[in-house]
């Protein structure tokens, strides 16, 4: 019985070993044929992927056409608005302030009454001077009559020559006194006139510096009120010294250089004026020169000490080739654009740029009017690649929001 069991275990072990050997031999014999099949399948998949890339959708881009325009050249600088004239109104006589005839902040004209000093003392002084003048005029008239009689009597030797000369001297002396009296009358009249304080220039009055009832003096430095002349008004801005020659040449050519004032953010045009003058020296610390422009400012858009951005038109480039600023790229070789041919294949082209702003760039060399350039999707481009030109998508917000420089033509230098 025991021998029978041992025999059965031996047979079972032999079957297992034979099965394992058969499996090992079979797997080794199939491996050389299976590997080429897997490799072929991988190559087929890769080839299919490459065919899918070639036959897939083209890279979408947006494009614009180079056009010719008349492009103005601007010189830009930072500036401050200043009053054409600033006058501190002071009293020229001493006395009590009895009235103010202006509202703070109002516009006044030259000659308008601003304040009144008590005129009583000046009227009294004028009356005294006029009385003295009248008295001396009477004295002169009497002295002249006596002189006429002395001259008649001297002919008959009834009066001496000495008496005649004395009477003539009296007349001359009285005439001198009358001239002094007339000057006193004029001075008293002037003092009375000065008690009425009028505006020396047209402009906007500021806040009052003194209240009615105060005793004021001609030596008061604060004055009564300050007037700033804002019609017209000036703008002082700076330009680099390298721009001086351009401005001087334009002036010598007889051009009236237009200056625009833009707000602090450089997004809204405030007013337009003309160049008035250049300073006579360059600031050595900054290498800039001061420029003064004048504006009529009838709409009061400019105020003294207001900070603005100034742009001065110095020239206009006719028939300039212009493309959107987004089309111009910068690389190691310099500025370039991606140009589209008739089959929508792109190629890189070096260009030389001129006048530019945040929207447009003048191409001074490298492009012609009518050339199409890529403005969006540039990062997906390679030399010779074919692309799909799509129209830009406009959102409702874009349709409702005007351009920051709507109505602005040309570019800034």
Curated annotation (Swiss-Prot):
Organism lineage string: Bacteria, Pseudomonadati, Pseudomonadota, Gammaproteobacteria, Enterobacterales
Keywords: Cell inner membrane, Cell membrane, Membrane, Signal, Transport
Taxonomic source organism: Salmonella typhi
Name of the protein in its database record: Multidrug resistance protein MdtA
Subcellular compartments: Cell inner membrane
Domain of life: Bacteria
Alphabetical list of HAMAP family matching this protein: MdtA (MF_01422)
Membrane-spanning parts: none
Biased composition (Basic and acidic residues): 397-413
Family in the record: Belongs to the membrane fusion protein (MFP) (TC 8.A.1) family.
Signal peptide: 1-20
Pfam family, one: HlyD_D23
GO terms under cellular component: efflux pump complex; plasma membrane
Compositionally skewed regions (Low complexity) per UniProt: 32-49
Subunit details: Part of a tripartite efflux system composed of MdtA, MdtB and MdtC.
Bilayer topology: Peripheral membrane protein
Molecular function in Gene Ontology: efflux transmembrane transporter activity
């Amino acid at each position: 019985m025991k021998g029978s069991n041992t025999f059965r275990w031996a047979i079972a072990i032999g079957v297992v070993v034979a099965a394992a050997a058969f499996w090992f031999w079979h797997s080794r014999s199939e491996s050389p044929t299976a590997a080429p099949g897997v490799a072929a399948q991988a190559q087929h998949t890769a080839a299919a992927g490459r065919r899918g890339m070639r036959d897939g959708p083209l890279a979408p881009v947006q494009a614009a056409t180079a056009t010719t325009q008349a492009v103005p050249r601007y010189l830009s600088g930072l500036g401050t608005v200043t009053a054409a004239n600033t006058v501190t109104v002071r009293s020229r006589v001493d006395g009590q302030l009895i009235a103010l005839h202006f509202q703070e902040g109002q516009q006044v004209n030259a000659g308008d009454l601003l304040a009144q000093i008590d005129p009583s003392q000046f009227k009294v002084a004028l009356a005294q001077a006029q009385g003295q003048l009248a008295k001396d005029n009477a004295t002169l008239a009497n002295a002249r009559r006596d002189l006429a009689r002395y001259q008649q009597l001297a002919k008959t030797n009834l009066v001496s020559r000495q008496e005649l000369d004395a009477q003539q001297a009296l007349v001359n002396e009285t005439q001198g006194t009358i001239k002094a009296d007339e000057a006193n009358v004029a001075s008293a009249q002037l003092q009375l006139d000065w008690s009425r304080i009028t505006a020396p220039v047209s402009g906007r009055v500021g806040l009052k510096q003194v209240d009615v009832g105060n005793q004021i003096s001609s030596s008061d430095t604060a004055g009564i009120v300050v007037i700033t002349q804002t019609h017209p008004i000036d703008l002082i801005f700076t330009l680099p010294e390298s721009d001086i020659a351009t401005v001087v040449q334009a002036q010598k050519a007889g051009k009236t250089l237009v200056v625009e004032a833009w707000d602090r953010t450089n997004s809204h045009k405030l007013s337009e004026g003309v160049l008035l003058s250049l300073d006579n020296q360059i600031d050595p610390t900054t290498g800039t020169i001061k420029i003064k422009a004048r504006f009529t400012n009838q709409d009061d858009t400019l105020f003294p000490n207001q900070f603005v951005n100034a742009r001065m038109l110095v020239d206009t480039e006719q028939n300039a080739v212009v493309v959107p600023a987004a089309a111009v790229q910068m690389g190691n070789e310099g500025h370039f654009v991606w140009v589209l041919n008739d089959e929508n294949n792109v190629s890189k082209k070096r260009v030389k740029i001129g006048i530019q702003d945040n929207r447009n760039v003048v191409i001074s060399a490298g492009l012609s009017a009518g050339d199409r350039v890529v403005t969006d999707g540039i990062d997906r481009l390679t030399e010779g690649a074919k692309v799909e030109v799509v129209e830009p998508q406009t959102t409702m917000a874009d349709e409702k929001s005007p351009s920051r420089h709507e109505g602005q033509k040309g570019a800034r230098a």
